[in-house]
């Protein structure tokens, strides 16, 4: 697995991507082209911190970058074009209008949300992104790949603890490959 920073045309950070080699047995065909996109023999999943429409056109000025920092929003690319992105609510109160399913609150991380998880779902449909809210505010997101990736960047939560951050836990998770997770915090002070 590779983690890749994405920069706009002005050279300011604009997002982050994870890439899985095509030789891996992951992702499922259901996840190819949304949210994973094939490029250079890797399946990429990308998240943007600014409106994807400006990344390759105008980017952000030095003044905007100084004022806004790393970004203003969180967009999950969900198709072959960055414009096919889902904007994530800043406030947890905006989540009920979406398909994100409330998981559990994990100490020092926050409340986990998983996309459209169901107890009886197929793991081929398991969307590999989760959101974290702390104090009602989006404070992190992460990737959860159903593949035992070997990287110092990822964690491998034992199946015995998955119910501590996911609710419901899809039955298929217990039969699927181990999860490889990576958390990306959007705050200067994650409570770790």
Protein language model features and the residues they cover:
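Primary mode marks residue(s) on the alpha4-beta5-alpha5 output face of response regulator receiver
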Residues: 1-192
């Amino acid at each position: 697995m590779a983690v890749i920073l994405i920069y706009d045309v002005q050279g300011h950070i604009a997002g982050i991507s994870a890439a899985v080699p095509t030789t891996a047995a992951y992702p499922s065909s259901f996840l190819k082209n949304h949210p994973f996109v094939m490029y250079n023999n890797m399946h990429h999943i990308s998240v943007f911190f600014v409106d994807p429409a400006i990344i390759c056109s105008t980017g952000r000025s030095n003044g905007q970058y100084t004022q806004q920092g790393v970004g203003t929003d969180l967009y999950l690319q969900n198709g072959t074009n960055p414009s096919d992105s889902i904007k994530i609510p800043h406030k947890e109160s905006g989540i009920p209008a979406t398909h994100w399913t409330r998981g559990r609150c994990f100490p020092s991380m926050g409340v986990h949300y998983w996309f459209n998880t169901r107890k009886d779902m197929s793991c081929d449909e398991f969307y590999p992104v989760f959101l974290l809210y702390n104090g009602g505010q989006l404070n992190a997101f992460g990737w959860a790949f159903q593949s035992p990736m070997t990287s110092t960047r990822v964690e491998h939560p034992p199946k015995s603890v998955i119910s501590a951050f996911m609710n419901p836990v899809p039955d298929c998770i217990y039969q699927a490959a181990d999860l490889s997770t990576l958390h990306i915090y959007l705050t200067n002070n994650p409570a770790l």
